[in-house]
Swiss-Prot record:
Homo and heterodimers. It comes from Oryza sativa subsp. japonica. The gene is ARF20. Residues 665-728 are annotated as: Disordered. InterPro entries: ARF_dom, ARF_plant, B3_DNA-bd, DNA-bd_pseudobarrel_sf. This is Putative auxin response factor 20. GO terms for cellular component: nucleus. Signal peptide: none annotated. One of its GO terms (biological process) is regulation of DNA-templated transcription.
Amino acid sequence: MAQPPDAAAAAAVPPPVVIDRDVWHACAVPYSGVLPGVGTLVYYIPHGHIEQCAEDPALLLSRLPDPIHPVPCTVADLVLDVDAESGEAYATISLLPGSHDDTTARRQVPAHGEPGFRFFEKQLSPADVTSNALVLPAGAEHVLPPLDIAAYQTARLFDVRDLRGKRFEFVHIWDKKRCRYMLGDLGVNDNDGWRGFVKAKRLATRDTVVFMRRGGGDGDGDGELLVGVRRAPRARGGHHPRPGVEDNKVVSEVWLAMQGVTPFEVTYYPREGTFEFVVSRDEYIGFSFSPFYPFVPGTTVHLRMNPLQIAQSISGTVRTFDHLRPWRMLEVDWDQAASPISYRIHRQVNSWQVLRQPQPAATTSAVRIRDAIVATPQVQIMALPRPPPPTTTTGMVPSDDSYAMISLFPGDCYVTHRPLPAARDPVGGQREFCFFDKKLSPSDAAANGGGSGALFVIPKPSAAEHVLPRIPDLRVTNLQGGRWEFGHTWSDADTDRRSSSHTLAAGWSAFVKAKRLCVGDTVIFMRRRPGGEPLVGVRRKPHGGMPVGIPDKHVADAWLDASSAQPFRVTYCPWQGTAEFVVRREEVEGSPPLAPGTRVRLLMNPDDARRRSQPPVYGTVRDVHCRSEWRMLEVDWDRDSPLAPTMNRRVNSWQVQPVQLALPPQGSDEEAAAATTSTAHAGDATTSAPSLALQLQTMASSSSSSAPIIPSRGSAFRIVNPRDGSQG
């Protein structure tokens, strides 16, 4: 009985092929194709998306606003499919702008296939494209239906489906004369076998065919045989045009992403010469901004491979690292002798695509057939090795570093202006908040270096007169509430108490060991008001004995919330060598343009009294990095300043002022003469309870580029991404 036309047409349509992650990774470029899970937090990088377009990426970038930053998103859906024209696998990723982290909703979609997945690949030579047979690489017989050579079976007919479901017939041949396996024709016409497959797929030299067996083992007829195609890069106008993403669609998707409101979809082709542009948040933040992964010239790196290509190892040496570029910021000289595909890898790669250490061994999983058919150790690249966590918490309790927690509202939504408690003039000739600091010498820190004891001698005794009471058993409290007891001695010179000397002996060695103080660290003694309890704090030198840092996740969370216009919180530590990254808006927008050769003066915090006694710091602008948003000025500081050796040459434009636009005088000459020296400071008076902001300014580094300027509640400001001197 004849079937109806519709039923016959439906029967002729091949059933679709389910593309799981194993098939996807086998068809993807070996160094690409990493897919995020549904529900994970990612960064969408428009530069990588634009790179897939057929037109010149630079021309398309000119149609978009500048600059274009990575956009934080959440993966809403992930669909794997095959291009109908080229046969290439691609992924459609649905993204939701902003942070919508739901750990319970995270899942691998689509999931991995059945155990026992095997595949081999072959890049076509000119002879493979023009001849009637394909010479198979070693190990192909473990994927294709096997031949019984002992029983003189030298040929076998089998069929295989492409990723669109279409069936092709091949002949598996054993060439006993040359001792090699081949894929041949049926000998009927030019449209069957290997020759027919080349014509149907319009294969060209340097294209790659991938044969896969999904499910089953090596037995006869076990599992499903599939064949995929990986196209080589081609010039525009060539004989085999490559399908791509429409330019207008890419532009609209970038605009939607930058608005941060409407969900959008992107299409990703894991082709040669391109990289994934939807990157996990942890990978992007950890490898682009983490201080544990500095890419200095000469560093040896290993290219990350997708999970099924881990048998290959490609290494290279870093030539340059441009942290200002959001895409392909790393230039690497690849070792072409180590891997046959090294010459096909672009020298410009992304920081999250390489690892500084060799890839460790792990469990055995899907096998990639190589020269030797053995169980290949595989590393799940999705589980990247993380840098060691810092020993300090957000509150910096182990290191005793002072910090500020600043709650921020994006935009101008918070208009109530509430300044912090201001300091008032001293009463009765004495200031209510007094302090002095001292940088530790080798003798001061001898207890931490293995010595039996140490003494803390105050070089200018007048500093301690209003801070340390004349008590033999001096009890001092640190900023975390811990109490310390020191043996305090002092000596008078005649009747002038300003010439007396103070020394801390007993208990000082235990304090040095407990705080792990090193030479160059600074100890600050403070007193809340005359007659109050003394306090002690620590200011660490750069890269001192205590590892300090803000976890990467805190920085990433703040970035995600800020990008989605949500309130967020940042932590600022006034360490030496860092600068405040929450800056008043009028300072950033009102900073004058500077040119190389301009004489500038470093701006100091006018509310910090200890700065008034220090001489101004002058310098000459050496270079201006216009594209940079952080530390865009390079300044040669005058060597006659005592702070010059500790100053960073790279500063921000709002941290300096041209000499021609001099600041108004900060107090009279008599006030400047009466100010205390750098080792004996008297802070501004506060209200009955001293402001924590004043304590933060006291704990700030005296040799930093500027004292910490804490924004008032409700003030408008800009938060700057500190890529050069990131605290996180």
